[in-house]
Amino acid sequence: MKATRDHASAPFCTRFNHSDPGIWAAERAVEAPNNLTLPPEPSEDCGSVSVAFSMTMMITGFVGNALAITLVSKSYRRREGKRKKSFLLCIGWLALTDMVGQLLTSPVVIVLYLSHQRWEQLDPSGRLCTFFGLTMTVFGLSSLFIASAMAVERALATRAPHWYSSHMKTSVTRAVLLGVWLAVLAFALLPVLGVGQYTIQWPGTWCFISTGPGGNGTNSRQNWGNVFFASAFAILGLSALVVTFACNLATIKALVSRCRAKATASQSSAQWGRITTETAIQLMGIMCVLSVCWSPLLIMMLKMIFNHTSVEHCKTYTENQDECNFFLIAVRLASLNQILDPWVYLLLRKILLQKFCQLLKGHSYGLDTEGGTENKDKEMKENLYISNLSRFFILLGHFTEARRGRGHIYLHTLEHQ
């Protein structure tokens, strides 16, 4: 009897152009040897779309984070104030974390797409899968915790300026950032020690934390470890989001209260109003980006844990296929956060964009005039350059200093630096 092809049960990639159709095909044939239905032939368009998507995300993330690291590093070398350097360290560490995380994972996905092979064929030992899952866990949680640390720093600077001015030093910032990274790394190594498991995820092009019972070779202890590790990851991620939201809201409240305390409509009062508005908008933007990118994945992981399911069932294309597709979208949203971070925190700030426009106008004006504009162009370039950017960071973080003998907050502004 001649075998036929069932296009109705075609893999996810064939229908939605997300993955190569041959990745799971061989495994389904092994699981159902009596089924005469053959998997659909590989689609070149499907593979090209997947590769283009992965390469676009990797290149975009690399460019944005590399630009942020360059600006921050130059600014850091020019700054003398310790409190100014603390916030620059946080920004630079976040950009470096996002960039390294993408560079370690995206090439693996691209190679797998281009090879048109199953993961097990390229990684028979499973070590690459463990490395991939560990990398996603480390750099994913690190980004969330660094964002939380930055939110805590902003809240302390505005609500406890005296304590912040006397205790917050560059060495403390370095220790906190290094401690965060080491703690997350230790947590991510738990599956290597037997607590939890990194498994191949739908549609077979990446590895991540297993959220439910493993394969046929897992016992009850391993299943318990999977549940514990996946639950801990989701709870830690959601806790980081809650801390970030709470601290950002506290910062906004402190700024609004300080703005209202200005009794007169002086220039200082107008400046405070502008700073408060711009900062509140940016902090709300940060909260929106974090919630949209991370909440779907973390909440869905908890849902799958409570339902005792995992993406292992996606291989058979059951009635839960929509859940598999949504899980893939949730992971891609989390990956998108690594691309958006440098733009939300730094590159799309109004002040920086205005300075770039001034620089462009300065170059254009200098082409048509002589002599008298050289000093002006040079001054604009210097203002645009990193020294002015560092002052802007102080506005962004709302670093404060307590004046000796006075009980009010003193805010560094661009005009007074």
Swiss-Prot record:
Residues 78-90, 153-174, 253-282, 349-417 are cytoplasmic. It is a multi-pass membrane protein. GO terms for cellular component: plasma membrane. InterPro entries: EP3_rcpt_1, GPCR_Rhodpsn, GPCR_Rhodpsn_7TM, Prostanoid_rcpt, Prostglndn_DP_rcpt, Prostglndn_EP3_rcpt. This is Prostaglandin E2 receptor EP3 subtype. Its main location: membrane. The chain crosses the membrane at residues 53-77, 91-111, 131-152, 175-196, 227-252, 283-306, 327-348. The gene is PTGER3. It is found in: Cell membrane. Glycans are attached at residues 17, 35, 216, 307. It comes from the Eukaryota. One of its GO terms (biological process) is positive regulation of cytosolic calcium ion concentration. Belongs to the G-protein coupled receptor 1 family. Pfam families: 7tm_1 (PF00001).
